[in-house]
């Protein structure tokens, strides 16, 4: 059994980890930390977990967690995971960070976009955790930086096109996200009266996920990729729908595009390519680790329009983290993740 610890167990990504791991046949949850709810059972905080995980939440104790666990998931604000990872690596404990601490190749880019006085993690060997790209590296990894939710939807949506050199490197991305993407802590923008019957753009042209997208898309393309990104908050709990506008280098019909995608993702269980004329919807991936991809060719402007849908808390966060854990420990990749989406 793989012994697991979670720092930040009562945030949305933390409790989603527990939901998934509680049904994992090769995992034992050994340690859960929470600054807000320590000494309470997790099932007293989230009654959805009654009978599935009733473990008592503890104060943050790095040494205790490292002595009890084979892998630690960190679902903490930026800047905390690097301190934990440095000690964990020395003790042979693996770390999967759901924050942004280990997503960037260049620490200076991280520091520029994520304000704060963070510890330089440049000496910590880490792998960016998209299995569809870095599976072999993840197998050997000690530290994995779990991708952001928006970048996951965008990278999976664009990878076949960039890998095959079909599109130009200037891409426009429009994404809609459920409110859970903003986290568990209450804020003005997350209030019911602000979100209900309302959709609004935020952090236009300055969202923190932009450099993460550009870093990975540029590596796939082999040259610089520029992303114009506009995220929106949609009146739903879960889900991300990303629409990407790409200039084709030559004329191409939708059936040719479909064949490129199906060939590229033929061995990827969690990526589903929809037939021409069918478009992704967040409802069709709700509660699952799947990514649905669809597309259309606008012949009038020679633009390829790609759409991808994920559940931001599963494939966009905790599900992908468990997928990475499975790979790191040689467990079948879809263990505990073979979840049929909830519909309607």
From Swiss-Prot:
Matches recorded under SUPFAM superfamilies: Glyceraldehyde-3-phosphate dehydrogenase-like, C-terminal domain, NAD(P)-binding Rossmann-fold domains
Q: What is its EC number?
A: 1.2.1.38
Task: Tell me the superkingdom of the source.
Answer: Bacteria
Pfam families per the UniProt record, alphabetical: Semialdhyde_dh, Semialdhyde_dhC_1
Q: Which InterPro entries match?
A: AGPR_AS, AGPR_type-1, NAD(P)-bd_dom_sf, NAGSA_dehydrogenase, Semialdehyde_DH_NAD-bd
Q: Which PROSITE patterns match?
A: ARGC
Q: Which Gene3D superfamilies match?
A: Dihydrodipicolinate Reductase, domain 2, NAD(P)-binding Rossmann-like Domain
The UniProt record lists the keyword Cytoplasm:
yes
Summarizing the function annotation, the protein's role is: Catalyzes the NADPH-dependent reduction of N-acetyl-5-glutamyl phosphate to yield N-acetyl-L-glutamate 5-semialdehyde.
Q: What is this protein called?
A: N-acetyl-gamma-glutamyl-phosphate reductase
Provide the species name: Thermoanaerobacter pseudethanolicus (strain ATCC 33223 / 39E) (Clostridium thermohydrosulfuricum)
Q: Which gene encodes it?
A: argC
